[in-house]
Design a protein with these regions (language model features):
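General N-terminal targeting signals
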Residues: 37, 97-98, 182-187
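Extended surface/linker regions that mediate inter-domain or inter-protein docking
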Residues: 1-17, 25, 132-216
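Low-complexity, flexible helical/coil segments
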Residues: 55-59, 107-111, 203-207
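Short, surface-exposed linear patches
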Residues: 42-44, 93-97, 103-104, 188-193
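Catalytic cores of secreted or luminal carbohydrate-active enzymes
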Residues: 78-153
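Inter-heme linker and motif-flanking segments adjacent to c-type heme-binding CXXCH motifs
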Residues: 1-92
């Protein structure tokens, strides 16, 4: 859909005829944008102010908001405008032989290999103070099974001068973990002994964790 998007879907591509690389430029595969690696280090970013400056509005009172509110907070009030996006994924229900039904958007609510899904359209983002950096869950990090595990932990707070209120898509789900060692398990999904052949979580987790040299 981004080959020829409407102005409502993408104002730069739909109205101005931009190509992806006009914003996501770079050299030697160092593409501008918030990848997992660059987001952790807070480098290689670009934003609206790189083209529009931090005083883009005719009304000066609106420009005062740019000190604490990211441009996207107002200018991207919803996402998944034309196609549904997955917002929940429950691996714990995988492996069942049950009837697969589509939701109101025509998307599958279940897949035997992957479990239950929830899809949404015209989603209102969730908002967080963010300074452009993040921490990530690393393989083998200990978890508390009683709490929600954040795989992407955004940095920033109201007292951080580099933080702004920023919109995010939050993906929630359930996945397997090692109840003895209290870390997330990495199952082998495909190939010999993989979960998609055996539908045996323990066997698949053992093989997967062996591949990253961790006990299961």
């Amino acid at each position: 859909r981004l080959l020829n998007p409407s102005e409502e879907l993408d104002v730069h591509m739909g109205r101005a005829g931009f190509e992806c690389s006009e914003c996501h430029a770079g050299e030697s595969h160092q593409i501008l944008g918030a990848s997992h690696g660059s987001l952790q280090q807070g480098t290689n970013h670009f934003g609206c102010v790189d083209c529009h400056t931090d005083e883009p509005h005719v009304k000066k009172i609106l420009n005062k908001h740019t000190n604490s509110i990211a441009c996207e907070t107002c200018h991207i009030p919803t996402f998944a405008k034309e196609m549904a996006t997955k917002t929940y994924w429950d691996w714990s229900t995988a492996g069942q032989d049950k009837k697969v039904e589509n939701d109101e958007f025509g998307m599958p609510k279940y897949a035997k290999k992957k479990g239950d899904f929830v899809w949404e359209m015209n989603v209102i983002p969730e908002y967080s103070w963010h300074n452009g950096q993040a921490d990530y869950y690393k393989i083998g990090d200990e978890i508390n099974p009683e709490n929600v595990v954040k795989l992407n932990n955004l940095k920033g707070n109201i007292n951080d001068p580099n933080s702004k209120i920023t919109p995010f898509k939050v993906m929630r789900g359930k996945q397997i973990y090692d109840s003895k060692n209290n870390y997330l398990a990495i199952p082998k999904l495909f190939g010999k002994g993989g979960y998609w052949k055996t539908y045996d979580w323990n066997a698949a987790a053992k093989l997967g964790m062996e591949s990253v040299s961790l006990e299961y």
